[in-house]
């Protein structure tokens, strides 16, 4: 009788342990992972198979939560690091959008004005919906140096930045047309921004993960694209 009552309780305890780390910080989750790994390492020979399976599943869940916590950490770090850049770019993009809108209202049939409004709309949506997990690439970078004075390595880096900016901008345009932007144009005009739990628009998952792991924690002293 007592043996039967322990299994549901063990499953219940494991569920509670896993639930307690959902949304928690990376350090707390790492501690839980170490505890479970230590238990499996030291007592695997004496633990029932059902408990081993349960703990291994719990371990998988904890590792998933750790990954999510690390991505949240990157998002918070980027939000703080690029706050002022995005603030000024959002103001500039919104001003340009409003100016372009007035032109279209004044002359609705003018194709040039329509194209200008389209570009300004994409720019505004780009600034607001740019992914939190990626190093922010400014739409209006400062410090335009003479190309002749730049080294080949710097030129290559600028070309790569331009290509990535275009890639993100094209994705924003696509989602704008599909109505799938995390923050829509109408919401932006109401003053809304990305929710703290939203990642923004995303490219292929591998690229986002590469940015999160390789760049965000290892390029503290690297010059930002905004200042290139």
Curated annotation (Swiss-Prot):
Residues 26-74 form a coiled coil. The keyword Protease does not apply. It is found in: Nucleus, Nucleolus. Keywords: Coiled coil, Nucleus, rRNA processing. Residues 203-212, 219-228 have a biased composition (Acidic residues). Involved in rRNA processing. This is rRNA-processing protein EFG1. It comes from Kluyveromyces lactis (strain ATCC 8585 / CBS 2359 / DSM 70799 / NBRC 1267 / NRRL Y-1140 / WM37).
């Amino acid at each position: 009788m007592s043996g039967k009552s322990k299994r549901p309780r063990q499953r219940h305890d494991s569920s509670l342990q896993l639930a307690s780390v959902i949304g928690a910080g990376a350090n707390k989750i790492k501690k839980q992972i170490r505890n479970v790994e230590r238990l499996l390492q030291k007592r695997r020979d004496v633990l029932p198979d059902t408990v081993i399976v349960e703990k291994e599943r719990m371990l998988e869940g904890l590792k998933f939560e750790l990954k999510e916590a690390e991505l949240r950490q990157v998002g918070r770090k980027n939000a703080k690091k690029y706050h002022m850049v995005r603030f000024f770019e959002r103001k500039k993009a919104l001003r340009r959008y409003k100016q372009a809108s007035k032109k279209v209202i004044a002359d609705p049939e003018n194709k040039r004005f329509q194209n200008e409004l389209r570009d300004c709309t994409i720019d505004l949506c780009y600034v607001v919906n740019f992914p939190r997990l990626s190093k922010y690439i400014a739409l209006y970078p400062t410090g335009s140096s003479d190309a002749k004075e730049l080294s080949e390595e710097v030129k290559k880096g600028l070309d790569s930045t331009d290509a990535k900016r275009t890639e993100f901008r094209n994705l924003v345009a696509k989602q704008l047309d599909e109505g799938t932007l995390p923050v829509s144009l109408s919401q932006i005009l109401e003053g809304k921004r990305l929710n703290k739990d939203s990642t923004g628009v995303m490219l292929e998952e591998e690229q986002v993960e590469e940015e999160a792991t390789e760049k965000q924690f290892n390029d503290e002293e690297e010059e930002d694209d905004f200042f290139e």
